Swiss-Prot record:
Tissue: Expressed by the venom gland.
Any single GO CC term annotated in Swiss-Prot or TrEMBL for this entry: extracellular region
Organism per entry: Centruroides suffusus (Durango bark scorpion)
GO molecular-function terms, A-Z: ion channel inhibitor activity; potassium channel regulator activity; toxin activity
Name the UniProt record assigns to this protein: Potassium channel toxin alpha-KTx 2.13
Annotated positions for site Aromatic residue of the functional dyad: Y37
Length: 38
């Protein structure tokens, strides 16, 4: 699930993904945007 957070590294997506989907969520940075894996 893509969220509206810009990124340049996967680490930048972990906090917003966990905030949106819970502590077990993961995240990747794809094409400059965060993609979360709930």
């Amino acid at each position: 699930i893509f969220i509206n957070v810009k990124c340049s590294s996967p680490q930048q997506c972990l906090k917003p993904c966990k905030a949106a989907f819970g502590i077990s969520a993961g995240g990747k940075c794809i094409n400059g945007k965060c993609k979360c894996y709930p």
